[in-house]
C-alpha cells in the first residue's frame, strides 16, 4: 500500500460538492438519452439513408437516389387537413403522438443523368421531450409553465397516442471485441466476437479443441470449419503467410504446425471456398457452392471489417488475432476475459435503439416505393412516368409505412429482432420514480436462469452503476440503474482516430506482425498495428486529450505482463464513464481558485474538462488508474481523485440518510420503496390526465436530508412527512411490522392524500356511416342501466364537475349502433335501428368526486371526453408506510391521542413502531436519523445525512445533551390509559416516513353474487371484474381431511357453478329437454321415461362435452339416493 505523503489539502469535501453541483446544473439527470437522441437526428438518420443509397425500380434506365434528410418541427394534421404546431400537453390531452415530419431529398436519375431533386415528407418521427427537435428545447421556466409543463420535468421520454413512454437502455456485450474463455465441460478454449454492422449482428467464434486443432464457426455454415481452411479461403495461401498472420512468437508458431499439417489436403483458395460451400449448400453444383462461400466470407464473416473482396486480408488478420488469443490462453500466457467487466459492456440508448428501428422501417418504405413505382409504370406507361418525373416520385411515397412501423414499436415495446419491453410506460408515481425510470439499464439475459455472475455486483460498477438500487425477485441484478455521475459516450468517427494514431507512429498490422517485443494496439477491439514504446505512446494520447487536441471521448488503456503487451484505444459509443479529478505529482489539479470561480459562476463544468482538471475514465482506462477516495489520502502514486464517494449511488439510493450504517439489503428495499411513495410528483397535476395518480396534501422536506436531494430537485417535489416516532411495543398491535398511529395526527391531516383516476370516452365512427353518440340513453334502449345511474349527467350526456359518484355511476352517457347489423323493419317498412348502451361508468370498486372534465377532439376529428375523478384517502387500517431505510409496515391500530403514551415534555408520538424490527435488520441508520431529526426539530435546522460525509453521530448526541435531552435519544414516557410512568425509557425521535401507494381502498374486495365466466359458468377472477375468491385445491383438501362434506358441497357447488342436467338412466347420456313441447328425451337411445335430473358442477358437464368432442363416449351410471 502506498505510504501517505505529506499532502497539502487545497480542497475540502464541501468544495468537491460544489463541483458536482456544477456537473448536474450543466448536464441534467437524463443527459444520456438526450445526447443519444440528438446524435441520432443529427447524423444517425442520414447514415441509415446513406446505407440504402437509393431505390432501383423495375423501370429501364431509371433510379432514384437519396439525398439529405431533415426533421421538421413537431406538428399534426387536423381532420380537416390543415397542419398545426403541436406541443406536448396537447398531445397528452388529445391522445396524439408528439412527432415531427421527416423530409427526404429524392434525386431521380434518368439514363445516368440526375434530374431536379424533390423534397418529400417520408413519415413522422416521435420526438423526445427536451431534445433539440422538441418545442420545449431551451425554454425558460416561465415559458414552460405557460405551455402547461412542469419546469422540473426532465424530458427524455416520448408521447405516443397520449401515453408517456420511455426507451429503457439495454446493456449488451461490446460489439466487434474479442473475448476468450475456457469451456471446462467440453475441454475447449473459445474466442468469441459479435461483429456488428448496419444493424446486422454476426457471432464468430474461434475454438481450440483438446486435440489442439483450431476451428472457426461461421454464420450460416452448420459445422465449424478448420481455421487453416478459412485463412486459405481469405487469400492467405502459403503456410508462412498463415503463421505470420497469427504471430511471430516461436511458441505460438510451434502450436500452429499441427494445424497446418492437419489441413494439408486443402492448398488453394478455390478448394477452401468449395469446402465451405459444400457445408453450406451440399449437393449443389460447384459454381453455386463457390458463390455461396464467397458471399459468406464477404458478408457474414466479420462484417464490421468490410463487405468487399478487398477486405478479406484484414479479416484474415483479425481471425489471426482471435487465434493468437486462444493459443495464448491455452499456453498460459494470458488469463480468461471477464465478460462481466464493464469494459466489455456497451449500453444501447434511445438513439441507438431508434436507429435500429428506423433502419427496418425505412427498409420497408424503400421496398414499398420500389413496388409503387414499378406498378405505376406498368399501369400508366412510360409517357406518364417521364412527363412529370417529380410528380411520379412524389406520388410513389406512402409516409404511413414508416410512421406506423415506428409508432407501433414505441407504443408496444416490440422491437425488430424479437426484443420486447424496450419501451415502457413512464412511471409517474412520484418525481424520483420518474428519474429512476429514465436512468434504468436492463440486461437482455433470461430471467429464468440463475446467471449468478451476471447478477453480481462487479468492481467496475463503482461510480457507474448504483450498487444498491435493483429490484427484488427474478430481475434482481439484471435491472440496474446508473450512478449519479455516470456519463455515456456518443462516439467519435473511427477514421479520425485511426489517422491520429498513424500520425503518432503506429505501424499498420499489414506492414509489421506482432511479436513479444512489440505492443499490440487495438482500436475499438480491432488490432490495427504495433507500437515500440507503449508507455510513451499512451502518455502522449492522454496529454493530447487533456490539452484538448483530441476529443475527450477517447480513452486509452495499457495492459502489460510478462508475455503480452497490449494497448486498447476506445472511441465508440455506449461506454459508461465517470469523471475524476486528475492528480499530478501528488497534487490534485483542482485548486481553490477553480472552486471560487465555480462559486461565482465564471467557470463551468465543461471548462474544467477542457482545462484538463477533470477527465472521464471508462472501465478500461480505470484499470491503469490509482484513485484516491478523499483529498487527504492523495500520495505521489495516485493518478486521480474521486469527486465524492457518495456519487457511487443512484438517485433513489442517495435519498437514504446514513446508508453506510444499514445492512445492504435494507438500502435496496429503501431505494425500491422511495419509488412507491406519494408526494407532489408533478406541479402541473391540475391539467394532467394520467390514468391514475396520487397527490400527498402536505409533503415535507426531510429534516435529516442528503445533499443530493437538493441537486436532483427532491426538495421541490418531496414525497413524505416527518413523523414523531416512538420505538415501543404497544399492546401487541404493532407486532410483525405493523405500526400504531395517532388518531389526532391523522385528523390534523397527517399522511392524507388524494387519488386521481381518469376515464375517457370517444365518439367512434364505424363502417357504413354509423357513429357513437354522447347522450342520456333512452330507457327503451338495449342494456339501459336504470335512472339513478344517469342522475348526474347534463343534457349533452356528460357529467357535471364536482358531482359525487359511486361505483357503476355513469360519467359519460353513450349509445352505439348495433354490433351486428340486425336491421328490423318497423311500421310502414321504415328500418329502425336498435342502438346499444355503451356508457362510460365509474369502476365498481371506486368512489370519488368529478375533478375535471375535458372535451376535445382526437386527431381523426372524433369527439373525445376525459373525466378525472378524485378520491380523498385518509390513512386507515392496512395502509402501507415505510421509512427510508426499508422498514415497511401497515397500520395495525389507530389510537385516540388521549390513549397514546406521552413524554415528559408532553410530546405525543405520531407513530409507534415495534423494537423487534430493529436488531435483526440492522438499520442503525434509522436510529441515527431519529436522533438527527430530533436535533433538527429542536434547533430549527436541517441535519446532513449524506452517505459517508453526514454529520457524525457523536456530534448529534452532544447537541442533544446540550438541549437537555439524553444523548441516547431515550425519554421517560407515561401510559396514556393509566397515566403511570412506563418502566423502561423509550427511544423517541423524528423520522421521515413515506406513505406508499399500496392502500386498502384499492385492494379490499369481497362479493356475494356477481358475473360468471361464459365457458365454465364459474365466478370471474379479480377485483376489477367483481370476481370471486378462489377456493383452491389445498383448501379443498383441508375440508376433505376434516370430513366436512356439506361444507365441501356448499363451497364447490352451491357457491360456484351448480347446474341441473337431465340424464338418461338407460344409456347414461345427457338427455335433451324440449320446453316448447314439454318433454324430455334421450337423443341417443330415444328413452323418454327413465330420465332423471342430476345436480352437478358445470365444469364436470363441460368435461363430458369435451370428451365427446374428442370421440370418447362417457356414460353416467345413476343409482338411487339412500
Swiss-Prot record:
One short Pfam name that applies is RNA_pol_Rpb2_2
Q: Which Gene3D superfamilies match?
A: 2.40.50.150, 3.90.1100.10, DNA-directed RNA polymerase, subunit 2, domain 6, RNA polymerase alpha subunit dimerisation domain, RNA polymerase Rpb2, domain 2
**An individual GO BP term:** DNA-templated transcription
Q: What Enzyme Commission number(s) appear in the record? A: 2.7.7.6
Provide the cofactor note recorded for this chain's UniProt entry. Binds 1 Zn(2+) per subunit.
Listed binding positions for Zn(2+) are 1064, 1067, 1082, 1085
Can you tell which superkingdom this protein's organism belongs to? Archaea
The family line of this record is: Belongs to the RNA polymerase beta chain family.
Identification of the protein by name: DNA-directed RNA polymerase subunit Rpo2
What species is given as this protein's source? Thermococcus celer
Amino acid at each position: 500500500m502506498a505510504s501517505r505523503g505529506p499532502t497539502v489539502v487545497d480542497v475540502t469535501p464541501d468544495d468537491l460538492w460544489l463541483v458536482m453541483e456544477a456537473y448536474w446544473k450543466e448536464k441534467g439527470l437524463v443527459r444520456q438519452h438526450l445526447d443519444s437522441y440528438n446524435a441520432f437526428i443529427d447524423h444517425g438518420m442520414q447514415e441509415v439513408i446513406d446505407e440504402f443509397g437509393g431505390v432501383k425500380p423495375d423501370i429501364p434506365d431509371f433510379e432514384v437516389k437519396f439525398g439529405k434528410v431533415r426533421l421538421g418541427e413537431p406538428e399534426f394534421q387536423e381532420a380537416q387537413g390543415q397542419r398545426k404546431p403541436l406541443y406536448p400537453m396537447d398531445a397528452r390531452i388529445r391522445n396524439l403522438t408528439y412527432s415531427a415530419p421527416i423530409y427526404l431529398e429524392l434525386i431521380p436519375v434518368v439514363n445516368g443523368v440526375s434530374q431536379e431533386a424533390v423534397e418529400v415528407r417520408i413519415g413522422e418521427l416521435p420526438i423526445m421531450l427536451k431534445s433539440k427537435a422538441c418545442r420545449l428545447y431551451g425554454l425558460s421556466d416561465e415559458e414552460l409553465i405557460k405551455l402547461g409543463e412542469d419546469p422540473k420535468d426532465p424530458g427524455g421520454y416520448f408521447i405516443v397516442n397520449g401515453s408517456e413512454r420511455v426507451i429503457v437502455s439495454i446493456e449488451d456485450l461490446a460489439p466487434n471485441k474479442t473475448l476468450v474463455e475456457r469451456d471446462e465441460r467440453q475441454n475447449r478454449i473459445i474466442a468469441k466476437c459479435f461483429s456488428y454492422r448496419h444493424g446486422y449482428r454476426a457471432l464468430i467464434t474461434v475454438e481450440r479443441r483438446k486435440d489442439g486443432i483450431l476451428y472457426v464457426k461461421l454464420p450460416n455454415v452448420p459445422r465449424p470449419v478448420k481455421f487453416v481452411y478459412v485463412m486459405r479461403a481469405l487469400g492467405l495461401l502459403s503456410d508462412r503467410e498463415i503463421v505470420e498472420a497469427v504471430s511471430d512468437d516461436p511458441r505460438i508458431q510451434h502450436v500452429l504446425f499441427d494445424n497446418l499439417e492437419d489441413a494439408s489436403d486443402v492448398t488453394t483458395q478455390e478448394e477452401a471456398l468449395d469446402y465451405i460451400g459444400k457445408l453450406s449448400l451440399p449437393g449443389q453444383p460447384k459454381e453455386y457452392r463457390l458463390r455461396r462461400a464467397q458471399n459468406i466470407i464477404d458478408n457474414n464473416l466479420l462484417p464490421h471489417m468490410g463487405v468487399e473482396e478487398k477486405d478479406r486480408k484484414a479479416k484474415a488478420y483479425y481471425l489471426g488475432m482471435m487465434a493468437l488469443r486462444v493459443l495464448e490462453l491455452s499456453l498460459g500466457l494470458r488469463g480468461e476475459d471477464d465478460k462481466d467487466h464493464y469494459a466489455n459492456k456497451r449500453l444501447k440508448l434511445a438513439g441507438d435503439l431508434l436507429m435500429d428501428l428506423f433502419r427496418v422501417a425505412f427498409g420497408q418504405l424503400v421496398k414499398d416505393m420500389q413496388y409503387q413505382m414499378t406498378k405505376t409504370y406498368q399501369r400508366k406507361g412510360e409517357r406518364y412516368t417521364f412527363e412529370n418525373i417529380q410528380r411520379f416520385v412524389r406520388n410513389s411515397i406512402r409516409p404511413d409505412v414508416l410512421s406506423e412501423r415506428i409508432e407501433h414499436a414505441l407504443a408496444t415495446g416490440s422491437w425488430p429482432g424479437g426484443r420486447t419491453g424496450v419501451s415502457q410506460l413512464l412511471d409517474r408515481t412520484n418525481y424520483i420514480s420518474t428519474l429512476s425510470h429514465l436512468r434504468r439499464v436492463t440486461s437482455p439475459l433470461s430471467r429464468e436462469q440463475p446467471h449468478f455472475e451476471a447478477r453480481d455486483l462487479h468492481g467496475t460498477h463503482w461510480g457507474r452503476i448504483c450498487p444498491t438500487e435493483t429490484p427484488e425477485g427474478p430481475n434482481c441484478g439484471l435491472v440496474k440503474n446508473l450512478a449519479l455521475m455516470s456519463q455515456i459516450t456518443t462516439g467519435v468517427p473511427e477514421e479520425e482516430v485511426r489517422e491520429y494514431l498513424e500520425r503518432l507512429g503506429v505501424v499498420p498490422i499489414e506492414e509489421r506482425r506482432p511479436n513479444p517485443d512489440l505492443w499490440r494496439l487495438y482500436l475499438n477491439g480491432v488490432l490495427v498495428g504495433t507500437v515500440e514504446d507503449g508507455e510513451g505512446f499512451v502518455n502522449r494520447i492522454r496529454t493530447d486529450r487533456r490539452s484538448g487536441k483530441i476529443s475527450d471521448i477517447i480513452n486509452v488503456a495499457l495492459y502489460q505482463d510478462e508475455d503480452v503487451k497490449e494497448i486498447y484505444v476506445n472511441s465508440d459509443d455506449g461506454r459508461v464513464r465517470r469523471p475524476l479529478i486528475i492528480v499530478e505529482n501528488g497534487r490534485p489539479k483542482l485548486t481553490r481558485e477553480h472552486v471560487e470561480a465555480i462559486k461565482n459562476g465564471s467557470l463551468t463544468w465543461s471548462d474544467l474538462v477542457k482545462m484538463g482538471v477533470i477527465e472521464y475514465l471508462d472501465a478500461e482506462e480505470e484499470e491503469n488508474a490509482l484513485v484516491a477516495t478523499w483529498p487527504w489520502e492523495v500520495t505521489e502514486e495516485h493518478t486521480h481523485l474521486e469527486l465524492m464517494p457518495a456519487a457511487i449511488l443512484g438517485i433513489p439510493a442517495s435519498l437514504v440518510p446514513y446508508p453506510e450504517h444499514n445492512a445492504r439489503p435494507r438500502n435496496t428495499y429503501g431505494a425500491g420503496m422511495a419509488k412507491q411513495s406519494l408526494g407532489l410528483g408533478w406541479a402541473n397535476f391540475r391539467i394532467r390526465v394520467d390514468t391514475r395518480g396520487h397527490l400527498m396534501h402536505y409533503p415535507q422536506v426531510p429534516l435529516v436530508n442528503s445533499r443530493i436531494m437538493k441537486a436532483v430537485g427532491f426538495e421541490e417535489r418531496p414525497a413524505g412527512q416527518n413523523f414523531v416516532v416512538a420505538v415501543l411495543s404497544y399492546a401487541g398491535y404493532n407486532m410483525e411490522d405493523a405500526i400504531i398511529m395517532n388518531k389526532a395526527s391523522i385528523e390534523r391531516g397527517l399522511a392524507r392524500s388524494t387519488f386521481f383516476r381518469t376515464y375517457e370516452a370517444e365518439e367512434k365512427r364505424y363502417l357504413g356511416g354509423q357513429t357513437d353518440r354522447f347522450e342520456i340513453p333512452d330507457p327503451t334502449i338495449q342494456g339501459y342501466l336504470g335512472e339513478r345511474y344517469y342522475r348526474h349527467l347534463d343534457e349533452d350526456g356528460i357529467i357535471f364537475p364536482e358531482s359525487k359518484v359511486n361505483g357503476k355511476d355513469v360519467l359519460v352517457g353513450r349509445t352505439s349502433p348495433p354490433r351486428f347489423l340486425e336491421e328490423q323493419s318497423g311500421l310502414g317498412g321504415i328500418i329502425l335501428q336498435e342502438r346499444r348502451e355503451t356508457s362510460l361508468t365509474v369502476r365498481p370498486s371506486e368512489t370519488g368526486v368529478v375533478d375535471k372534465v375535458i372535451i376535445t377532439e382526437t386527431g381523426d376529428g372524433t369527439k373525445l371526453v376525459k373525466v378525472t375523478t378524485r378520491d380523498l384517502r385518509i390513512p386507515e387500517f392496512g395502509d402501507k408506510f415505510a421509512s427510508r431505510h426499508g422498514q415497511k409496515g401497515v397500520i395495525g391500530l389507530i389510537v385516540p391521542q388521549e390513549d397514546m403514551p406521552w413524554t415528559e415534555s408532553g410530546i405525543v408520538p405520531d407513530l409507534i413502531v415495534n423494537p423487534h424490527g430493529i436488531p435483526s435488520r440492522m438499520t442503525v441508520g434509522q436510529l441515527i436519523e431519529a436522533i438527527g431529526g430530533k436535533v433538527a426539530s429542536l434547533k430549527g435546522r436541517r441535519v446532513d445525512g449524506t452517505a459517508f460525509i453526514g454529520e457524525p453521530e457523536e456530534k448529534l448526541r452532544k447537541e442533544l445533551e446540550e438541549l437537555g435531552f439524553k444523548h441516547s435519544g431515550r425519554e421517560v414516557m407515561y401510559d396514556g390509559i393509566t397515566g403511570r410512568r412506563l418502566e423502561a425509557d423509550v427511544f423517541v425521535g423524528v423520522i421521515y416516513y413515506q406513505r406508499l401507494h399500496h392502500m386498502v381502498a384499492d385492494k379490499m374486495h369481497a362479493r356475494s353474487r356477481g358475473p360468471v365466466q361464459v365457458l365454465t359458468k364459474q365466478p370471474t377472477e379479480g377485483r376489477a371484474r367483481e370476481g370471486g375468491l378462489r377456493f383452491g385445491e389445498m383448501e379443498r383438501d383441508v375440508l376433505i381431511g376434516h370430513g366436512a362434506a356439506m361444507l365441501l358441497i356448499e363451497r364447490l357447488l352451491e357457491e360456484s357453478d351448480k347446474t341441473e342436467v337431465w340424464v338418461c338412466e338407460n344409456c347414461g347420456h345427457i338427455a335433451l329437454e324440449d320446453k316448447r313441447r314439454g318433454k324430455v328425451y334421450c337423443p341417443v337411445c330415444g328413452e323418454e321415461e327413465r330420465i332423471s335430473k342430476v345436480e352437478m358442477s358445470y365444469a364436470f358437464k363441460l368435461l363430458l362435452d369435451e370428451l365427446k368432442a374428442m370421440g370418447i363416449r362417457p356414460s353416467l351410471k345413476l343409482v338411487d339416493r339412500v
